[in-house]
């Protein structure tokens, strides 16, 4: 975000549009731009709650902007930033990109290669002004190094066609003990454990949180949780 803010500062746009997919990211991004630009630029939000149409720098979610394109001139923004632009293959983003005619369009992402083979680079003319790969970031100590463990799990039959039946195998007493065993084996000794587990479905997340509750303080988050619940 700071990289985009400093590039925008160098470009010196009269009107800037910043698109994100989530409200909490929007507020952090706006705060970053306020830090870089100071109080000389009127910045505002265009979301379900705020409609700061007079702002020179407008920060909006893709959903809100996609629903309100007719309120804006095609050339209204001379600089547009698409944050988390690996999402830009979605229809709402494509409508925004196709509608506006900025002098400069910038996309930011840490994961440009999508699993569905949709080409994010093509949306930006295959022009990559700056790229920093994970290995280079690690070598330059820009991010915390990590250790990756591949653990063989023979307790689950992944060939089952019924997804719910397959997921139910994850929460058996035997499998939970297996998970806890490896968590304890690889965790840092004598330090508070903070862990994030990615699950296949909402029901899977709920079931795993409940199954591991006897061993750890657990909670599960889904798209239905609001920002306050996520932060807490």
Where are these regions (language model features)?
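Walker A/P-loop
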Residues: 1-7, 194-198, 221
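Hydrophobic residues on the short alpha-helix immediately C-terminal to a glycine-rich phosphate/catalytic loop
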Residues: 3-11, 29, 96
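Conserved helix-turn-beta segment of the N-terminal RecA-like "Helicase ATP-binding" lobe
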Residues: 13-16, 23-49, 215
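Conserved helicase ATPase core of P-loop NTP-dependent helicases/translocases
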Residues: 27, 42-53, 206-207, 216-232
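Conserved helix/coil segment N-terminal to the catalytic DExD/H
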Residues: 48-79, 90-95
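Conserved Walker B
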Residues: 80, 84-86, 205
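Post-DEXD/H (motif II) to motif III coupling segment of the RecA-like Helicase ATP-binding lobe
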Residues: 86-148
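Conserved interdomain linker/interface between the two RecA-like ATPase lobes of SF2 helicase motors
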Residues: 128-196
